[in-house]
Amino acid sequence: MLLCNILSIFLAFSLLAGAQDWKVVRENPQKAFPKTVAAGNYSGIAHLHDDIYAVVSDKSDSALYFNFRIQVNPKTGELEQVENLGFTERTDGTLNDGKFWQGQEKGFDHEAIVKASDSTLVITSEGYCRLKEYPVLPTSANAPKISYQQNLWESRWPSSDFYPNYNFESLAFDSVRQYLWTISESTLRKDGQPATPQNGLANQLRLMRYDWGKIKENRNEENNGKEDCSEQESSKKASRYMTAYAYQMDQPSTHKKADIYVMGVSELCALPDGQLLVLEREAFIPKIKIGAFCKCKLYQINPLNSEEFALKEKFSSDTPFLKKRLLAEWKTGLSLSKRSFANYEGMCLGPKLEDGSQVIILLSDSQDQYAGVLKDWFKTIVIRKE
């Protein structure tokens, strides 16, 4: 028995130690594909199948998501081709038949997307402060019509919890453990002020993990029992399966006055071993626009081996903030001679390379290629666990 206990402890420590060894193999340069990717407001990305990805736009009130074909070099992970194939599903969950259509809801501001199963996606709406599950519809107009499933999940939050344009920007899905992850972009109102160049604060955020397996099991039981729940009641029930952690961002890197300044977590990505990638993004835009920059930092965290932090708890000097490890950082900008400014908002796992390395795909929001100056940039980073 003693030997078994020793072996169990050794195995546990081995797993903990092995969970810290992701490293960047290669950071590839960003690329734009203007001939095959029309100007857009692309803000989130998820892998669907093969080389097809779902991409959401924070300005579209008609397309639920766009189908993108993304091809990478199998040896280096460098982007070879990116193409927008159009959209097949409308924001109300119906099939796009190519005819003019205008939905009843507007202002979704979809920011992130994940594939939760072979038949459903989850999308964040910053405009409605919600996380919502949608069915994946067949792409053929001749396929049988699929109506909304009655047990699709939705979680709404009061807009008063967030500062303007600072709520749900991120989603990640751990398909192995069936966990759905999200985090607010900036500090919640109840927790203080958002970071600015003037106050120099470090945003204190609440990382949230939903036990998707238990949520779906509960919803299936309700459906079998013919229990009809309101959206508000559904959100309350979903919160029973939610666990939270404390995350602290870096402080602003500048103290200059900005016309537009955004500092927050713009995306999450779940790794195969249960760890997460966190994309911290700082965008600084002066009134004259020249001198604008966007600084991105990619961190690795391991919340499953960390102390939890309940939503009702207040931040203090004793708060168990998640330990984070910097994997990569890069800076783009706008000057008289250079127009590389890229506000990266989307991130997901790409393919594995021939040597077993993992590709991370990132996309930026060009604000519809603002003023003809910005571009829809894409980027890949190759990581490996050794």
Task: Walk through the language-model features, giving the residues of each.
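Sequence/structural signature of beta-propeller domains
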Residues: Q20-E386
